[in-house]
């Protein structure tokens, strides 16, 4: 293990030197990529340094005990050895998890799409609840959110809402939220007090850079239209909203959130690029799924992943059998418990595959 950690330390030292070079700082794309790699290796190198010191302490303590000439030193060495041996398995476990290979997309920003499914107006209201849940979670994480496009429901919420999330390790954190979310509750419009079941689909797309996906402009039809608000009323009289249609795939992306046609077009291209990138990832994930059965796959958008049962105050994640009895907290963005448990299961699966130890 130490040999592998030494290679990582050398790589870390190289990056540390590179990120202070003027030519690297001037190249923002390269600087950002190297800085992310630096942050990813920093904690591992710190653990490596602790491991080296710990192994040296164990060796020193064993030598003192073997010598046995100084009784006081032997007692101190025994205490040092006991402490080191107690810490060693914990440290090895921490290093083991840090050595698990991360997905290349984990550091990327994301586009989140929430669409109302079965359940009519109640499904739109639930989609709005999920939107608020995620934006509050993002706010607590210090991430920025920006609405790209929305289609509001007739009784509140959204038939569809697309928003961008920017920050650190966004995709790696949110990717397991993709899938079908189901709600069981009495709708506000229900007069008989009957519980209804509705659903909304969440998609989490890693934001693609221009070098990730090449789009031939000849393959894209661009339409301009007047942006509209709730109920379809016109927000402005200029055709500032933009709709893009990728002819080879039939994928459509639009944006009407910005006042400027140019900004709407840029954002719409961002959505289109991410959708095309997600298609490529979905194919890769499908190939990976043939090789292994993952409990927490982030690729199947049709899988029912979570149920929000209001009458019982219970939120259940069906992939890992986790129940959380804090409906108010969850709907106000307290979903870290789900994030942590899903990442843990995913890491355990990767650990079995990677054969690090």
From Swiss-Prot:
Predominant place of localization: cytoplasm
SUPFAM superfamilies: Release factor (SSF75620)
GO CC annotations, alphabetized: cytoplasm
The keyword Protein biosynthesis belongs to this UniProt entry's keyword annotation: yes
Modified residues (N5-methylglutamine): 233
Natural source organism: Flavobacterium psychrophilum (strain ATCC 49511 / DSM 21280 / CIP 103535 / JIP02/86)
Homology family: Belongs to the prokaryotic/mitochondrial release factor family.
Lineage of source species: Bacteria, Pseudomonadati, Bacteroidota, Flavobacteriia, Flavobacteriales
InterPro entries named in the record: PCRF, Pep_chain_release_fac_I, Pep_chain_release_fac_I_sf, Prokaryotic/Mito_RF, RF-1
Post-translational modification: Methylated by PrmC. Methylation increases the termination efficiency of RF1.
MF terms (GO), sorted A to Z: translation release factor activity, codon specific
Keyword list, A-Z: Cytoplasm, Methylation, Protein biosynthesis
Name of the gene: prfA
One Pfam short name: PCRF
Gene3D superfamilies referenced in this protein's UniProt entry, alphabetically: 3.30.160.20, 3.30.70.1660, 6.10.140.1950
Function: Peptide chain release factor 1 directs the termination of translation in response to the peptide chain termination codons UAG and UAA.
Record localization: Cytoplasm
Protein's name in the database: Peptide chain release factor 1
């Amino acid at each position: 293990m130490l040999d592998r950690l030494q290679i990582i330390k050398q790589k870390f030292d190289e990056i540390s030197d590179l990120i202070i070079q003027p030519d690297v700082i001037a190249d923002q794309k390269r600087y950002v990529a190297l800085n992310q790699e630096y942050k990813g290796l920093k904690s591992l190198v710190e653990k490596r340094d602790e491991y080296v010191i710990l192994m040296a302490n164990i060796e020193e303590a064993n030598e003192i005990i073997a010598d046995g000439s100084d009784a006081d030193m032997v007692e101190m060495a025994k205490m040092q050895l006991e402490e080191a041996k107690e810490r060693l398995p914990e440290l090895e476990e921490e290093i083991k998890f840090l050595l698990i290979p991360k997905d290349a997309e984990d550091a990327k920003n994301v586009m989140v799409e929430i669409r109302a499914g079965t359940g009519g107006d109640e499904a739109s209201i639930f989609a709005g609840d999920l939107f608020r849940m995620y934006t509050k979670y993002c706010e607590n994480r210090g991430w920025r959110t920006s609405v790209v496009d929305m289609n509001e429901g007739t009784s509140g919420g959204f038939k569809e809402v697309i928003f961008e999330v920017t920050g650190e390790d966004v995709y790696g954190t949110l990717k397991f939220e993709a899938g079908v979310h189901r709600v069981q509750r009495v709708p506000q419009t229900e007069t008989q007090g009957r519980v209804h079941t509705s659903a909304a689909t969440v998609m989490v797309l890693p934001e693609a850079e221009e070098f990730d996906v090449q789009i031939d402009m000849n393959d894209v039809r661009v339409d301009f239209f007047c942006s509209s608000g709730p109920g379809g009323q016109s927000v402005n009289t200029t055709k500032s909203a933009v709709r893009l249609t990728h002819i080879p795939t039939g994928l459509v992306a639009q944006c009407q959130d910005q006042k400027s046609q140019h900004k709407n077009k840029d954002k719409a291209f961002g959505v289109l690029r991410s959708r095309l990138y997600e298609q490529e990832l979905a194919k890769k994930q499908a190939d990976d799924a043939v090789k292994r059965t993952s409990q927490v796959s982030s690729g199947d958008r049709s899988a029912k992943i979570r149920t929000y049962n209001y009458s019982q105050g219970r939120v259940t994640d069906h992939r890992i059998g986790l129940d959380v009895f804090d409906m108010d907290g969850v709907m106000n963005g307290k979903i870290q418990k789900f994030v942590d448990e899903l990442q843990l299961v995913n890491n355990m699966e990767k650990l079995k595959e990677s054969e690090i130890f």
